[in-house]
Amino acid sequence: IIFGARISLTIGLVPTLISMAIGTVLGLCAGFYGGKTDFIIMRLADVMLAFPSLLLAMVVMYTMGGGLINIFIALSLVNWAGTARIVRAQTLSLKEKEFVEAAKSIGVKKWTIMFRHILPNCLPSLIVLFTLNIPSAILSEASLSFLGIGAQPPSASWGLMAVRGKKYLFSEPWLSIAPSAAIMIVVMAFNFLGDGLRDVLDPYLKEQ
């Protein structure tokens, strides 16, 4: 279980970081530039959100094959759209603020405004979203491993351990129960952490 935690948590962290980085950049561009840039990025995000992320990840994995690297790529490519929409919405609001207008008036470059002035104000929401996306990635890996297209031996993720233990479900049920319980505990822990951070970082909830 401890060894499998290394693989499962890595799968939770790395694709989440990559997908959120992609979504953040695209969301900033869509919200700040508007026009055709906004239209193209948001329509692409709508297409991604129209299908379950696990289904899209399955298509990518069936195309590329199993393995940890391909899991990283698949989960990174299919989970950026939600982040992009959130960052875009905040960018649309922030770019009308006085500090952004002041930066524009003195000739600050657009990319500098986006990453030095707007992005820091999006960080509280991104931190909360990050903690909530990690368990989603862990569950996606477990589902892909259950279907035989996720982590492959000799890797030992919790998802793969649970799948390989199902052969002995009646004689040695702990082989599947233990990694499944580990997944459940970690997912719940990250969800509670995300809820707590949202309560702390959301100024509206603070006022309440």
Residue ranges and their predicted role:
Residues 18-93, 127:
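Generic hydrophobic transmembrane alpha-helix motif, especially the helices
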Residues 61-63, 75, 90-91, 139-182, ...:
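Glycine-rich helix-loop "coupling/hinge" segments at transmembrane-helix boundaries
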Residues 1, 37-44, 48, 158-161, ...:
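Hydrophobic alpha-helical segments of integral membrane proteins
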Residues 1-10, 14, 34-42, 92, ...:
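Amphipathic cytosolic juxtamembrane alpha-helices at the membrane-cytosol interface
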Residues 28, 57-62, 71, 75, ...:
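Transmembrane alpha-helix boundary and packing residues in multipass membrane permease domains
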Residues 61-64, 68, 75-78, 124-134, ...:
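C-terminal transmembrane helix and the adjacent membrane-cytosol boundary/short C-terminal tail
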Residues 19, 23, 27, 31-35, ...:
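A short glycine-centered flexible hinge/capping loop motif at secondary-structure junctions
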Residues 8-23, 50-58, 120, 124-141, ...:
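Hydrophobic alpha-helical transmembrane segments in multi-pass membrane proteins
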